[in-house]
Structure formats: C-alpha cells, structure tokens
Amino acid sequence: RLFEEALIQAQIPYRVYGGQRFFERAEIKDALAYLRLVASRHEDASFERAVNQPPRGIGAKTIDAVRAHARDFACSLWQASQDLLRGRAMPARAATALKTFLDLVDEVAQGTEGTALGDRVEQVIARSGLVEHFTNSRDGKGQDRVENLEELVNATRRFEPMPEDEGLSELDAFLAHAALEAGEQQADAYDEAVQLMTLHSAKGLEFPLVFLAGLEEGLFPHSLSAEDP
C-alpha cells in the first residue's frame, strides 16, 4: 500500500501482479461510495453501491422503482428516493429501510462537517455499518477487510492535497486522488512500469532489475526458517 502511494505521488505507472490494488478492493469501494455520497448526494453510482451495503432490507424492486422515477423525471437517485418517500409510493417496509439510509447519510454528513479529514472518514466508516458487517462475516476474509478499512483511514490522515486541488474541500481532494489511484496509474500488463509482486511470484521471470523490500532480520528470511537445522 505504501509503495502504491509513493508511485502515485511520483506519477510512475505500476502494476500489482496477481492481486488487486488497494482502491480496487470491494470494501474500499464500499467505503468510498459512502464518502462520495457525503460529499455529494447526487452521485448515482455511489448511491447504488451503498444503498444496500451492508444489507438493510432494500430489495431489487425498491431500487428498480427508484431508478424508474429518476429516469422519468431526469433526476438523481437520491432525489428520486426523496420524491417516492414524500409520495408514499412504496410499501411501508421498503420505505422505512430507504428512509433510514437517507437519514444515515444526511446525519453523518452534517455531524462530521468541519472535522479533520481522517476523523471524518473514520466516523463515516463507523456509522456506515461496514466494520460490523465484515467483522461478523463468515467467509474468512472479514478481518482482512476491516484492516483495509482501517488502512483507508490511515491513508486519509497521511493525505496532503496537491496544488491542483486548490479550491476543493479536503474530502473532495482525497476522493479525486482515490479515483486517480483506481484508474490512470494502473499499467497494462506489457507496459513499461514498476511491477509490484511477492518474491514467490517473481521467481523465474528474469527481470533486469529487482528491488527486495522488507529484507530485514527476522522478517526476511522469517525467524522461524532461521531456526530450522
């Protein structure tokens, strides 16, 4: 993750070999969807990703109704949701779940306004329910996902806006940075670029130049292997 940040700052193309980059991971995309909604309620892609993640009883029929209203009235999904709730145009259970989501985003946006970026992101993630959702996950990956969310908070605490971010809020500047990390800096497989990979993955590839990171006593080789006869 720290290598990715440094390469982005230096505008050096890179590729993560055999794995996902940090900002491509599902749990990070989930958290960013909430952050984008906090920054702007009318981000439709973020609305679709966050509205039922974690699951809160908002089904496909409800989302279809919101999409149809947004299409018919040329408005955002957020505005369509508000319109449908005011018009009582959906079943009570679905309406309650949808209103709970809208209220959550409004409350966390207003309640964190003016706070430091890292603190704001930490509170948004906590209120979203994502940490609890992944903590209770039974797929064996929940703890890793929670740790990635914690690393996202750490990344916002380290974040320093660039000169071109002048005029943007800290949150908007970070979201623009995240969008860049998720897109343009990812090199194609055969581009001239820095390749990030494990030592095991690098075996036999015959790169002309290789840097070994973490070559520290007790870490590489691992202390356990040093004890073997």
Predicted feature locations:
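Conserved helicase C-terminal RecA-like lobe
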Residues: 3-13, 21, 25, 29-229
